[in-house]
């Protein structure tokens, strides 16, 4: 109980910031799914493990766990596969999808549409292969080279990718981007 209370308090830092924090993304998503029969079918490492800190996991199937395939485009195909398994139970499959990871295999959303695989995907779009950006920044700093060029070949901008249009072109409902929440 104390850990959940502390996590909920920690999640409030930067709550109204833009872009939306991964804590708020996770908290807002939890508020929408908590009364459903749901399964988190994505890893949590790239969203600072907020779902594990804020959500209540009380069924064995509610989290498929991490893959270890970081940076290799594992997320979206794994989510679609898990959603396929959940389909026969009528379970809501939830995927918090990183943008860089998705760009390895975006065609998997065509597969989901073609085979009528229900999946709620929320894109965490930081416009970068962020794990790689941070690694390059650490290495540049370690070798006293400065971090100003860490974005070369690691960012997904100019042009920015419109993920809602990308998935719409494959037959999937897409909406966004959402850069701020207002009620």
Regions found by a protein language model. Give the residues of each.
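Active-site diphosphate/adenylate-binding microenvironment
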Residues: 2-85
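Thiamine diphosphate
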Residues: 50-183
């Amino acid at each position: 109980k104390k850990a959940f209370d502390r996590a909920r308090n920690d999640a409030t830092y930067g709550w109204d910031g833009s872009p939306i924090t991964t804590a708020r993304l996770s908290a807002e998503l939890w508020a929408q799914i908590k009364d459903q029969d749901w399964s988190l079918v994505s890893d949590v490492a790239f969203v600072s493990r907020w779902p594990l800190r804020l959500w209540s996991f009380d069924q064995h199937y509610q989290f498929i766990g991490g893959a270890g395939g970081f940076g290799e485009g594992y997320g979206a195909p794994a989510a679609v596969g898990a959603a396929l398994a959940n389909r026969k139970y009528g379970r809501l499959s939830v995927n918090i999808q990183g943008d860089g990871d998705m760009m390895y295999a975006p065609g998997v959303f065509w597969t989901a549409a073609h085979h009528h695989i229900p999946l709620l995907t929320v894109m965490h779009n930081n416009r970068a292969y962020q794990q790689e950006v941070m690694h390059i920044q650490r290495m540049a700093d370690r070798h006293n080279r400065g971090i100003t060029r860490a974005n070369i070949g690691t960012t997904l901008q100019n042009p920015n990718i419109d993920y809602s249009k990308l998935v719409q072109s494959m037959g999937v409902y897409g909406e966004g981007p959402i850069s701020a929440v207002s009620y």
